[in-house]
Amino acid sequence: MRVLSARFRVLLACLALVIPVSETNFLSKERASQVLVRKRRANTLFEETMKGNLERECIEELCNKEEAREVFENNPETDYFYPKYLGCLGAFRVGSFHAARQSANAYPDLRSCVKAISDQCDPIPCNEDGYLACQDGQAAFTCFCKPGWQGDRCQYDVNECKDPSNVNGGCSQICDNTPGSYHCSCKRGFAMLPNKKDCKDLDECALKPSVCGTAVCKNIPGDFECECPDGYRYDPSSKSCKDVDECSENMCAQLCVNFPGGYSCYCDGKKGFKLAQDQKSCEGIPVCLSLDLDKNYELLYLAEQFAGVVLYLKFRLPDITRFSAEFDFRTYDSEGIILYAESLDHSNWLLIALRDGKIEVQFKNEFSTQITTGGNVINNGIWNMVSVEELDDSVSIKIAKEAVMNINKLGSLFKPTDGFLDTKIYFAGLPRKVESALIKPINPRLDGCIRGWNLMKQGALGAKEIIEGKQNKHCFLNVEKGSYYPGSGIAQFSIDYNNVTNAEGWQMNVTLNIRPSTGTGVMLALVSGGTVPFALSLVDSRSGTSQDIVVFVENSVVARLEAVSLCSDQQSQLKCNVNRNGLELWTPLRKDVIYSKDLQRQLAVLDKAMKRTVATYLGGIPDISFSATPVNAFYSGCMEVNINGVQLDLDEAISKHKDIRAHSCPSVRKIQKNF
């Protein structure tokens, strides 16, 4: 019983708590039914003919959803409004429960709560960054955009940089679009002007004078460049100009020589190449004048060897035989040995030579020595029949079968031994070193030809077979007076250019008479060690039909005569006078010599070389680097040289290529016309 009594008391306490709460949350029966009852409105006479009004319909009075529809006149807005409207009613008409007020956004009164429901601008439907204002409308809203924005909600940025009415936003260089605006900027190397639209170039060279170091600073729009002379490249790390090694880039066809600021291409002229007009590739040196180089194996050339005997024959004949030699002889040379004969023991000898253009005979036997020079001058370039015959008591010399000399003698020229006459005959030279044994010294070298020889009355026995198969022992058929350079060798002279009577110290006056057969080659050069301090050369002109006469000091051109027609059947004269103070180049064909602007400095280089030992070369340069001078091809053609008033005789040279003809030059080949 006590237990039940306790439980009853607890139940009564719970009911006591529930009853007040229920009274708070639930309306009375009368009040609750009022929501569903439409009160009588004012103006009921015209109510159905007037458009709904939110204030009148739903604030001053309570409205149902149909009446709310009359206010908004569209379903979407009505559907949006009415649930929120009921929330406001629950907050402000029914009671003041705190949670209900929170759900109505804590509006101060019912009117504010209901008014806010239909405001299309609350919450703001516009883009917060782009809108300026929002205007509420019935079932609509209008967003007013800030400058630089567009769209119904101001959600799109206006790209002023692409406005066709204001190209590039009015910026002179870069237009940068930003949300709702834009701004102008400048490229690197430019600065913005106060108008914020135009850019001005910055002169980096003036702002930073040392920006290029030792190079030259050049301002350009928006930037600067560090310039170097041709042949140099700017090195940013050292801020200096470094030489460009063009040769590492295979610029030249044959030899490339790099030097500070440039490079030069060279071709091996000694192999018949010259530098082409592009100054990089090589091409063959063409013949500009054809010479008659035809030879005859029956003509023995006496100057095949610069030093030494051309042909050696030995005869062993009966002791009754006497010496005799008969031959046709042609030369323009004035001095030299035709033949030398001797006994086996060298005790007796006979020399037949030419001195001053006349026949000279020297001999020695066991009884006497004799020398005789006489007769007509026969170095006239035509064939002359010469005979030397030993008689009983004399030696007879005939030219064209006419006796010109008769030399008395005692005994035989050569003494027989054991019933035989042994005789050795040498053509165009002396055996061993017997010059000292001669009665009168003579230059043995002789540029001449013999044919139809009959020695010791044995005809051409032995000699014909020797020379027949050797081209270098054959003579040209047609020659003229002059010196011939075949384009394959040089001649060297030792010349003293110092002039003690001249205040200039040294002088070189050169006169050349030339008839070139190729348009490129070195005519005269001075060589000192591995350098060429002076060279007088021919170079084919750019036209291809004429030649340039060029003077070089080492690798520099100091004088040039352009476009001279030298490849003709007539010889041309050329003069070059030079000393330490000046240079003069002259030819009657042209007067307009081009001299280097740096002539005096280049002459100083030559002057320094002339104070040392220099060797003079004709027809080319020796075997030194063919980069020592721009032209290294051998000269080809006829040429006679006079230096300081002395006519150079190639027979007097220190050395001479065997194919150089000292006193004869092939004639110009005649072109036969077909009729």
UniProtKB/Swiss-Prot annotation:
The iron and 2-oxoglutarate dependent 3-hydroxylation of aspartate and asparagine is (R) stereospecific within EGF domains. Residues 117-155, 157-200, 201-242, 243-283 form the EGF-like domain. SMART domains: EGF (SM00181), EGF_CA (SM00179), GLA (SM00069), LamG (SM00282). It is found in: Secreted. Glycans are attached at N499, N509. Residues 42-87 form the Gla domain. Residues 88-116 are annotated as: Thrombin-sensitive. The modification 4-carboxyglutamate is found at E47, E48, E55, E57, E60, E61, E66, E67, E70, E73, E77. GO terms for cellular component: extracellular space. CDD domains: EGF_CA (cd00054), LamG (cd00110). Its main location: secreted. Keywords: Blood coagulation, Calcium, Cleavage on pair of basic residues, Disulfide bond, EGF-like domain, Fibrinolysis, Gamma-carboxyglutamic acid, Glycoprotein, Hemostasis, Hydroxylation, Repeat, Secreted, Signal, Zymogen. Residues 299-475, 484-665 form the Laminin G-like domain. Residues 1-24 form the signal peptide. Residues 25-41 form a propeptide. Anticoagulant plasma protein; it is a cofactor to activated protein C in the degradation of coagulation factors Va and VIIIa. It helps to prevent coagulation and stimulating fibrinolysis. PANTHER family: LAMININ G-LIKE DOMAIN-CONTAINING PROTEIN, VITAMIN K-DEPENDENT PROTEIN S. This is Vitamin K-dependent protein S. It comes from Mus musculus.
